[in-house]
UniProtKB/Swiss-Prot annotation:
This is Outer membrane protein assembly factor BamC. Part of the outer membrane protein assembly complex, which is involved in assembly and insertion of beta-barrel proteins into the outer membrane. It comes from the Bacteria. One of its GO terms (cellular component) is cell outer membrane. Residues 1-23 form the signal peptide. Gene3D superfamilies: Outer membrane protein assembly factor BamC (3.30.310.170). One of its GO terms (biological process) is Gram-negative-bacterium-type cell outer membrane assembly. Belongs to the BamC family. Transmembrane segments: none annotated. Part of the Bam complex. Keywords: Cell outer membrane, Lipoprotein, Membrane, Palmitate, Signal. A lipid is attached at C24 (S-diacylglycerol cysteine).
Length: 384
């Protein structure tokens, strides 16, 4: 059964149960904007205190001893471990301090600058995605890359009368025609002791391909910068920033920026992207742009300014056999479906106060092909 018809089928199957409820009325709660589905995301509600009682005040004198693994053998050593200073130190070992976390923006791209090394932030970032409702599909700690599996935003399902009454009884039958996934990159920041965290979104939507509406296929949809921004804001809160402070930081980054990139053509027809950024910032922005347009970074050499990438069809990634949108354009299609996609070299070069971006051939020369021009065009849309 295809997913677009699932709601209709569910309504028909339970219509007889609702005849007696026709006269019932009630208000529907405003759904959350983001509510991704996963089995591990369901949490047991906290115990509610009856109106005539008050919540007990916590007294650390009766707290269960922590198992920090230090194994204090004397009462004085044990008391030292249980002191407020010691507990504060243990807490900092679990969740890094990010009082200096901030949102930076260049063009239509945003990223989070947080205190701590990538290794120290890796665990909290992974926890964030799992708590948000995603399954982690790819983990490359050495490369600083983490990617979620495809998931649906349950908040986009219409909260109609039928679904509101039956609730979770038939909730699994309902689904949306959209899927989202996110890739996170953690890189050492330009300031020692900080990490730049980039979040890129990729989306798919399901469409009918037959007049009888009995077959569907998935198509890629554009990256959503606002959804990326919301995830950055939530991650900032998850890492320790106050809600109001994180919201204010994101609002401050909403100003419409000046165009930061332009395309030029040489006498030989080769294309070059000129980015009005220093190499450090241009390198990071190009990496995020590659994530957004569907490239997989197989390797990178910052000292040489090179990204080694391949294009990954999102439909294949979503376990569908149909060709994706970019594949239909024959931009990245290999000569044989059984062969792996061609590897491309994206070259970022420092040029005084700005940077340039080019596509290179395997021999190291500037690629003058139509494919190269289209790749630069895709990057320009992200970097301008």
């Amino acid at each position: 059964m295809n997913k677009l018809n699932s709601v209709v089928v569910a309504r028909g199957a339970v219509a007889v149960l609702l005849i007696g409820l026709a006269g019932c009325t009630g208000s529907l709660l405003e759904p959350k904007k983001i509510e991704y589905k996963t089995a591990s995301a369901n949490k047991v509600p906290t115990l509610e205190v009856p109106p005539d009682l008050t919540s007990p005040t916590r007294d650390d004198r009766y707290a269960v001893p922590d198992t920090s693994g230090k194994g204090a053998a004397t009462f004085s050593a044990y008391s030292a471990e249980r002191s407020p200073q010691a507990r504060a130190q243990q807490k900092s070992d679990v969740l890094p301090e990010v009082d200096t976390a901030r949102i930076e923006r260049s063009g239509n791209q945003r990223w989070l600058v947080a205190s701590g090394s990538p290794d120290k932030l890796w665990g909290p970032v992974k926890d964030f995605w799992q708590e948000t409702g995603f399954v982690i599909k790819l983990e490359l700690p050495d490369a600083g890359v983490m990617e979620t599996d495809w998931a649906e935003n349950r908040a986009k399902i219409q909260q109609d009368f039928i679904r509101n009454i039956l609730g979770k009884v038939i909730d699994s039958v309902y689904s949306t025609a959209e899927r989202d996934k996110f890739r996170t990159r953690l890189e050492p920041g330009s300031t020692p002791g900080t990490t730049d965290i980039f979040i890129s979104h990729r989306g798919m939507y399901e469409i009918f391909v037959t007049e009888g509406k009995d077959q569907t296929k998935w198509q890629p949809r554009p990256a959503d910068p606002e959804l990326e921004a919301e995830m950055l804001r939530r991650l900032m809160v998850r890492l320790g920033s106050e809600e109001k402070r994180a919201t204010a930081a994101m609002q401050a980054a909403q100003e419409k920026p000046l165009e930061r990139a332009k395309m030029t053509r040489g006498p030989d027809g080769s294309g070059t992207l000129e980015v009005e950024e220093s190499f450090d910032r241009a390198w990071r922005r190009v990496g995020l742009a590659l994530d957004r347009v569907g490239f997989t970074v197989e390797d990178r050499d910052r000292s040489r300014g090179l990204y080694f990438v391949r294009y990954v069809d999102p439909e294949i990634d979503n376990e569908k056999k149909e060709e994706g949108f970019l594949s239909k354009l024959n931009i990245f299609k290999s000569s044989s479906s059984g062969k792996p996609q061609t590897q491309y070299r994206i070259f970022v070069k420092d040029d005084a106060s700005r940077s340039t971006v080019q596509v290179l051939t395997l021999e190291g020369g500037v690629d003058q092909s139509e494919t190269s021009k289209r790749i630069l065009s895709l990057l320009y849309d992200q970097l301008k």
